[in-house]
Structures are given as structure tokens and as C-alpha cells.
Design a protein with these regions (language model features):
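Transmembrane alpha-helix segments characteristic
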Residues: 16-23, 83-96, 215, 260, ...
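Interfacial juxtamembrane loops and adjacent helix segments
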Residues: 124-166, 170, 324-338
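Transmembrane-helix signature of polytopic, membrane-embedded enzymes
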Residues: 86-87, 192-219, 235-236, 249-255, ...
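Membrane-lumen/periplasm interface segments of specific transmembrane helices
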Residues: 264, 270-371, 462-467, 471
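Membrane-interface alpha helices of multi-pass inner-membrane proteins
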Residues: 171, 197, 211-216, 239-244, ...
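Hydrophobic, aromatic-rich transmembrane alpha-helices
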Residues: 63-65, 69, 189-195, 277-286, ...
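Hydrophobic/aromatic-rich transmembrane helices and adjacent perimembrane loops
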Residues: 115-116, 224, 231, 364, ...
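Signature aromatic-anchored transmembrane alpha helix within multi-pass, membrane-resident enzymes
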Residues: 81-90, 296-305, 393, 424, ...
Length: 558
């Protein structure tokens, strides 16, 4: 290890390589068997697919170790610190391209489709879509009803189950026909906010460049940034919330509350609640904290009432349209079911959370979590570092009490709302926060030397080029295979496609429709050949079966 003379570089390389190799072996070993260990199929499959990603991370560590003296990586980081807008613009263009070419402008999972569906409704100026009530079980698989999409079995009204903040953000893009551009824009804005947070912490442009590129180069930011998940919105909202409270004033507290209320209602309140709790305690306990906390609450209230309480009541009304007797107990029953989401973790949940931490590791720049842990420890005297550490730990620990794994998703979705803590704390291992200046004659900390910074910069640049490139190839293949699980019919006429999920992987997720069944294709989920034929004869007598394969049947007038 002749190129790694500094203790910081040796420590970062050896620890990074050992942990990455352990994750590689874990994923590889599980891939050899069929035991899912109580995990959902999608979560299990995506974890064993991280085996080659971990191998790639090892190669990047090796490349950075031997290549850092020869790469202009440090100059790139320095330039990025001075040109954040240029970096964010490049990121926006790459993410927009990825949303179309890599992600195929496709809501892959039901979490994505629910927000996509509701944004179409909002873009049309409505609160709910409408399906023919007798066909609901074909148009929305029964297990998805009132879980992802609320339905009225009396009227056929349909709206997303989650709170609608992200769907509202997506709606203008949907109206303009560029829904795929929403998350790339949110992700690019997040880069600018993280750069600004780093300047507040370190007052150093190179440090801000490290925080910026540690974020941009992590594949999880790319993958979520080209998707239809609400996670980029959570990350941006929480980052802005923190930025507003770095130097709290009454006006900034009101603004932080307003941003926080949007974060609470993006799709569910747990991500922001866990992130924001340490900040609220800190604001309340500082001098003048009562006034600041009052202003924060005032900022939270309007959108929480409108989107939070309002959507809760609207959803209850939709669910019980035409069922007057049940409506009296609807709200209390739904509130009780919402609270039941928290429970003590069992073995499967603990395992899922440990896998989540492993996924956070392999979907980031190699060594990022080591640096973040070191930064949290070494800079613990800085109040902002303590707050970011508390938010990260509370988010990480809080989800141990949510009794489901994340199913589909890139990286560890449940941590993404607090993900900005990692590059900021990692940078705190490389640079000292301005609030904790170096004491006279004190030795340099483990990772503060220039050689370690060169090594980290090389990891950043190699991951940006090769790590994201590899993950983009993986994601594109996964989404393309998913899209291929429909009948391979070439016609474009008006038709009904009935999907048979027996030969597909999460084929029910492909039953995606316009809120009013506009367009040339209606998708349904098969209830068996006899039931499908009976349905078609009753409601679409003019259509005949024109195509069939293992993925389903196609019905049209052709």
C-alpha cells in the first residue's frame, strides 16, 4: 500500500474494503438459496442484486487508492465548491435524461403509481378519479385497494391513500406533460441546499464542494432522482427546513414551519417527524425559544390542517360514500389503524433494517458512512453536527418500530429523508466546523490530511463516472424487464389488456390506468379465464380476444 502512507487513507481504505466485502459475501450467499428470511420478494431480490454493486464499490476503492495521485479529483472538488449552480445544472440534465432513458418514465412500484395517479387527478382540477364500480376489482387489484388507492365501492371514486403533498408538487409537471422532470428538478435543488448547508457549517468552499459531490456522486441520489418516489421531495424539504433553522429568527421559523408542513404531508408524516424532532427540541430550549417555537407551529398549521386533516377527512368520506351507517365510526377506525403502524420489531424487521444500513453503504460513495460516523464523533461539540447526528440516528432507529420492509426501492428508502446528514457529517471528518476551531498546537485529526482528502476526492469522481453508470445499467435493466411483463401485442387501437400475474414478478403493479380510463389502453388484473370472459361479455360486448400469451390477454374490436 505504497500510495497510502497516511493513517487516514489506510484506515478509510481498509475499513471500507472490509465492510464492503462483508456485504458482498452476505448478498452473494443469500443469492445462492431461496429462503427469503421473512422479507418481501422485491426487497429480497433487490438486496441480492446489490452483490455486483458491492463488487463495483471494492473496485472503486482500489482504483482510488492507486489512482488518487494521478487524478485531478481534488481540483474538480475545489471547482465544484465555487460553481454549485453549474454542478446542479449538469445534474439536472443527467437526471432528466435518466428519467426517460433509464427509468422509461415509468412508475415502477405502487408507491410511485399512487402519487402519479393522484397528480393526474389534480392536474385535471379534480380531487378523485372515477372507475366503473362493478369493475373495481379488475382495475385495481383487491390487495391494493384502501392500501395504495382508496376506493368507493358505491360510486367508483378513486384517490390515493397517502397524503397528497407530493402529488400536488407533481401536478404542474403532469399538466405540462413532463412529469418525469419533477424529481430531477427537486434533486438538483437539493444539491444547492446541501452546498449552502456546508457553507454554514464550514465557511469553506472546498468543504462545500466535498459535501456537494459526495451527494451528487452517490448512486442512490441518481436512482431516486429519476424515479417517481416521493423521497427526493422529502430530502429537499428536510434540507431546506434545516437550512432555515441554522440561524433561527421568527421569520425563518415561520418559513421552516411552512416547509415542514409540506414535508409532513408529502405522503406520510413519519419521515419529517423523525428528522425534525431534534431541531424542534433545540429551538424550544434556546434563548427566546418559546417565541421561535410558537412561530414554527404557526408555520406548520395551515398546510397541516388543509392537506393533513383535510385529506384525512376527504379520504374517509370517499371510502364510505353510500354507507351512512359506517361513516359514523370511519374516522376513529382509520385513526386507530394509522397508529397501529408502530409496533415492537420482530426478527424480520430487525433483519430488514440491518439490510437497509447495508444498502445505504453500497448505494453511496465508498467510505461515506465511515467518514460520517467519524465526523459525528469528532465534531460532536458543534451544535449543528449534533443536530444532524440526532436526526440521522432518530430516523434510523425510528423505523425499527415500523413493521414492514420497504419492498421496492433504491438504496434504503426509509433513511432517504435524512440522507443529507451523511455528506455533511462526512465533510466534518475532513474539515473542522467553524464553530469548533482548531486549538493551538493540537494535532490534525485522522482524516484531515491532504492525502486522505485526495483519496476521498478520487472515490467521489470514480463513483460519479463508474458507480452511477453501473447502477444506471442495473436500474434500466430492472425497469425494462418489468415493462416486458405485459402481453407482447403490437396493435395501438383502443383495447383492454387483462394481465395474468402468475408468470410475472409483481405483475399486479403494472395495472396502471388513467383516473377516468381515458386513452387507448385499459389495464385489468385477471380473475381467471372464465371470470374475465364473463366480465368482458357484460361490460365490453363489442370487444373480442385478439391476443394471448403467458402475461395475459388483449381484447379489442380488431
Amino acid at each position: 500500500m505504497s500510495h497510502a502512507r497516511s493513517a487516514g487513507t489506510r484506515t478509510l481504505f481498509l475499513l471500507g474494503a472490509m465492510v464492503t466485502a462483508a456485504i458482498l459475501l452476505w448478498a452473494y450467499q443469500w443469492g445462492l438459496g431461496t429462503n427469503r428470511h421473512g422479507l418481501s420478494a422485491s426487497f429480497f431480490v433487490l438486496f441480492i442484486n446489490d452483490y455486483p454493486g458491492a463488487a463495483f464499490a471494492l473496485l472503486i476503492l482500489m482504483g482510488a487508492l492507486f489512482g488518487s495521485p494521478h487524478l485531478p479529483a481534488r481540483r474538480v472538488v475545489h471547482w465544484a465548491g465555487h460553481q454549485p449552480l453549474a454542478i446542479a445544472t449538469v445534474a439536472l440534465l443527467l437526471l432528466a435524461l435518466g428519467a426517460v432513458v433509464v427509468y422509461h418514465n415509468h412508475p415502477l412500484a405502487m408507491d410511485e403509481y399512487a402519487a402519479n395517479f393522484q397528480s393526474r387527478v389534480f392536474a385535471a382540477g379534480e380531487l378523485h378519479g372515477t372507475f366503473p364500480a362493478p369493475q373495481l376489482d379488475w382495475l385495481i387489484p383487491r390487495g391494493f385497494q384502501d392500501y395504495f388507492l382508496n376506493v368507493s365501492r358505491a360510486t367508483g371514486s378513486v384517490a390515493e391513500t397517502y397524503w397528497p403533498g407530493f402529488a400536488l408538487l407533481l401536478a404542474p409537471f403532469m399538466w405540462a406533460g413532463v412529469a418525469w422532470l419533477c424529481n430531477p428538478i427537486l434533486s438538483a435543488l437539493t444539491l444547492l441546499v446541501i452546498h449552502r448547508l456546508a457553507l454554514e457549517l464550514f465557511d469553506d468552499r472546498e468543504a462545500a464542494g466535498f459535501a456537494l459531490l459526495l451527494t451528487m456522486s452517490s448512486p442512490v441520489i441518481f436512482a431516486n432522482g429519476i424515479s417517481y418516489y416521493s423521497m427526493p421531495a422529502h430530502l429537499l424539504a428536510n434540507s431546506v427546513f434545516a437550512l432555515l433553522l441554522v440561524r433561527p429568527t421568527p421569520f425563518r421559523a415561520v418559513a421552516a414551519g411552512a416547509v415542514g408542513s409540506l414535508a409532513l404531508t408529502l405522503h406520510n408524516p413519519v419521515p419529517h417527524t423523525l428528522f425534525a424532532a431534534p431541531w424542534l427540541v433545540w429551538v424550544a430550549t434556546r434563548p427566546g425559544g418559546v417565541k421561535l417555537l410558537t412561530m414554527l407551529i404557526a408555520g406548520y398549521l395551515p398546510l397541516c390542517v388543509l392537506l393533513g386533516l383535510g385529506w384525512f377527512l376527504f379520504s374517509g368520506h370517499l371510502l364510505h360514500e353510500g354507507l351512512a351507517a359506517a361513516a359514523q365510526t370511519a374516522s376513529s377506525d382509520r385513526l386507530h389503524s394509522m397508529l397501529k403502524i408502530f409496533s415492537l420489531p420482530d426478527t424480520a424487521v430487525v433483519l430488514a433494517r440491518l439490510i437497509g444500513i447495508a444498502k445505504t453503504w453500497v448505494w453511496a460513495v465508498p467510505g461515506l458512512l465511515i467518514l460520517a460516523a467519524a465526523g459525528a464523533l469528532l465534531s460532536r461539540r458543534d451544535v449543528l453536527c449534533r443536530l444532524f447526528t440526532a436526526s440521522a440516528l432518530l430516523t434510523l432507529c425510528g423505523y425499527f418500530f415500523v413493521p414492514v420492509d420497504q419492498g421496492h426501492g433504491w438504496g434504503y428508502r426509509y433513511f432517504h429523508s435524512a440522507w443529507m446528514t451523511l455528506p455533511l457529517l462526512a465533510t466534518a471528518a475532513l474539515f473542522r466546523p467553524t464553530r469548533t476551531p482548531r486549538e493551538a498546537n493540537s494535532p490534525a485529526r485522522l482524516f484531515e490530511d491532504n492525502e486522505t482528502k485526495d483519496f476521498v476526492a478520487a472515490c467521489v469522481i470514480l463513483t460519479l463516472v463508474f458507480g452511477i453508470g453501473f447502477r444506471a445499467w442495473q436500474v434500466q435493466g430492472f425497469v425494462a424487464r418489468d415493462l416486458g411483463q405485459v402481453p407482447q401485442y403490437k396493435g395501438t387501437e383502443k383495447r383492454v389488456v387483462i394481465l395474468d400475474g402468475r408468470s410475472s414478478f409483481y405483475g399486479a403493479d403494472l395495472v396502471q390506468n388513467d383516473p377516468w380510463l381515458r386513452g387507448n389502453e385499459i389495464r385489468m388484473y385477471s380473475h381467471g379465464a372464465a371470470a374475465d370472459e364473463k366480465l368482458m361479455a357484460q361490460y365490453y360486448p363489442e370487444l373480442r380476444r385478439v391476443y394471448a400469451d403467458r402475461y395475459g390477454t388483449v381484447w379489442s374490436v380488431k
